[in-house]
């Protein structure tokens, strides 16, 4: 197991040199403590070299990963004596390590010590003053000159015959008050950096505390307790024991009675400031430390467990044991990282774009996946079906059966069509003649504009389906296609062009459907209500209204249909078994009689005008023969009388000849007055016959509109599916191949996105690092 620490060193070099952070949480010993507590002196004593920067205020401003590597040494007998980094026996290692720290024999051929920095790996430093200068320069380069700190570590390796294999991480000392141009939050920055390292489960905390201060105020122990409350991975170091007050000692602390730690405390005596100024050598400093513990009355009994050599040996053994304990977990974590990174790399795709034939295959596969995804989304066979909202073909179904149907059903068949409009159309369709029957021309004139109301929802339905297909097109690319932005854009544009091409005939066909319905009004359609059905509805409604009115007025209820002509023919019977059809049949037999009645009632215009002026209501009542006469044509005098209703007091011949005949108000009749009478003729209060005509037209329009609406609701989705949706599905594959599969397009379309390319290369680097780390661990585990 002697190679465990070098193994961790290799892993540290690997991860910091490639990734820049310890993603494996490698076992390490982290040195923490307050500013000027003696951390630097402890490290220099362990190394046996004076190499760390010194000064006032905060000096260590970046983490220093210090890797101590023991070099083999040769004796005069030319025997290779292996360094005692990780011996199987603690007794053997103790003797060897003590010798390593205290120097070598005078008769040995000393090997020159040297240092290396990870950021300049090809440079060896044999002068420790230059090492100190490089640490200062590198700190200044990254952390700046304002005494601020930086999390990027400095990796330093020291090769020496006087050291044990050991790795330590020196962190900035915790300071309370910023001095000079230090940031005002320097304490928070330092604390955050320290917590980042000591909170890792695989780190051993080396808490340095000065013995000449109360241990309960130790910042290092306070920080350690915050992450290791039971003290299982904290080892305490007491410095400056030689500076304690006379008559006092630290035996209670060293024995664990004051502040118990599982790993215990180790006492050290470092060089004082005067020793540093006088350039006291490390060998002399270690000799003075050993002499102090041997002759001190309180510490002489535990001298074997005090001093820098014992601390180095303890830390080395502790680190080896910690590595051995954590190595299986590290290997398992590494295996997980390799698997995850490999999966992530697979998601980015392993494209061999250098091979021209492979480029063609990649392009064809991308087009096939795009087309298949587009079709599957419409058919509902997509592998990624969302559960939170409708998508693909389900949205098309919703458009047809919810949006489109609701829009059509919400249209009023008589929208924008007033009673005056209907009456005017009826009058205009009859021309200058009186009407005998209900005008079919008026029905045609009125119903065609109403059918055109169906066009707008149909057009909107086509547009909505087109928009949904465009959305499906934009979401049809998979992760592999997204790696090539230009290819994805070309695929979307090609399919968009196809959809636009299919949109035009679809739009035209839907317009033709509306035009077809307006081109021929099929009143013989079996679902059309017809005149008889419309008459039944109108009469039924009038009867219901009459009954309701009679009940409100408490009048005797007698059927309004019990009307008998003067000749004794009963047209309307109160018998409920009498149908509208029988009534109509009776009415057709009377048409000849009605015509003769009309002839008999023809009178000169002036007489009619006089009669209407003198007794309009009695005349109107007298002219009513039967209710059917209002539908199939009464006497012609009714229409003629209405045409001169407003001007009945003016003899027409006198008015036109400029006579002096005046109205009862003595206003002369003018041509403009006659014109106004003609324009407002349709606005007059309608007779009962005219009301029936209007109601019949309304019922017929409503019936035919509903009939046409059902046809449109059924046919428009079929047209859209055939000409737009299915046509696009059938043609998408051939269109993509014919437009994009060209060798001169390969270089243009298969250009990877820079971000994707960068991420894939990063994954490849990570995977390489993980595999190398796994290979390193496999050498010993």
From Swiss-Prot:
Residues 33-40 are annotated as: G1 motif. It comes from Schizosaccharomyces pombe (strain 972 / ATCC 24843). The gene is dnm1. Residues 23-328 form the Dynamin-type G domain. SUPFAM superfamilies: P-loop containing nucleoside triphosphate hydrolases. Residues 170-173 are annotated as: G3 motif. This is Dynamin-related protein dnm1. Residues 76-103 are annotated as: Disordered. Gene3D superfamilies: Dynamin, middle domain, P-loop containing nucleotide triphosphate hydrolases.
